[in-house]
Amino acid sequence: MNVKDETFWSVHNLCVNYEHAAVLYHISFSLGKGSLTAILGPNGAGKSTLLKASLGLIKPSSGTVYFFNQKFKKVRQRIAYMPQRASVDWDFPMTVLDLALMGCYSYKGMWGRISSDDRREAFHILERVGLESVADRQIGQLSGGQQQRAFLARALMQKADLYLMDELFSAIDMASFKTSVGVLQELRDQGKTIVVVHHDLSHVRQLFDHVVLLNKRLICCGPTDECLNGDTIFQTYGCEIELLEQTLKLSRGKQFGSC
């Protein structure tokens, strides 16, 4: 198969239940090379669950998931996963540089030796995300936006082809937002595929060329201009797009002022 036509992530009839309640119901879609995709949906829609079930972090009830037309374990070195910030132990005694260097483990293994070249590359990546001045700081001492950028640096060190990012833009300052967007667009232009669980509809058309609309079931997957409309928004969120965007604008102003 031509790499240009390679399917990076394909989900087939995926179902996930928690205590007999359906969280994801027969989800099927696929994403190819070189896209910047947002997974959108209300709280409880199953967005994070979709990532975790695809990566084997939780067990699906049924269905199959393939990355690059293979099971995850065979191609895990080609995939970078960024968890939600709330799931991280920020008291762990690790510096920002140490966190970035963890990205090497995907291709060196847990016991692989970290070389001076690796350290130089990690520091260069920290410069790229604007964290070189806090490289030796313990990760819990960072602001929310800096913490997100530190995990972005770790993902970049993995040199992956597919990036799955759970709420990358949640509760970050505007400087971190702009830096992160620039990095993601560079990756997309290099032929990488980036998937971000996202909440703010007011940014979607400007940032993402593809969307996955989800509310326990798949509403739409495809180019943003084709999928994002009044009908699909109503199916996903249960309200009109104008009201939803007004609410999100107010919450976004509070969000960017809090970091």
From Swiss-Prot:
GO MF assignments: ATP binding; ATP hydrolysis activity
Binding site for ATP: 41-48
Membrane-related topology note: Peripheral membrane protein
Keyword Cell membrane: yes
One Pfam match: ABC_tran
Domain of life: Bacteria
Protein location: Cell inner membrane
All copies of domain ABC transporter, residue ranges: 3-241
PROSITE patterns, per database record: ABC_TRANSPORTER_1, ABC_TRANSPORTER_2
Keyword Ribosomal protein attached: no
Record keywords: ATP-binding, Cell inner membrane, Cell membrane, Membrane, Nucleotide-binding, Transport
One cellular component term from this protein's GO annotations in UniProt: plasma membrane
Family of this protein: Belongs to the ABC transporter superfamily.
Purpose of the protein: Part of an ATP-driven transport system CPn0346/CPn0347/CPn0348/CPn0349 for a metal. Probably responsible for energy coupling to the transport system.
Name of the protein described by the UniProt record: Probable metal transport system ATP-binding protein CPn_0348/CP_0412/CPj0348/CpB0355
Biological source species: Chlamydia pneumoniae
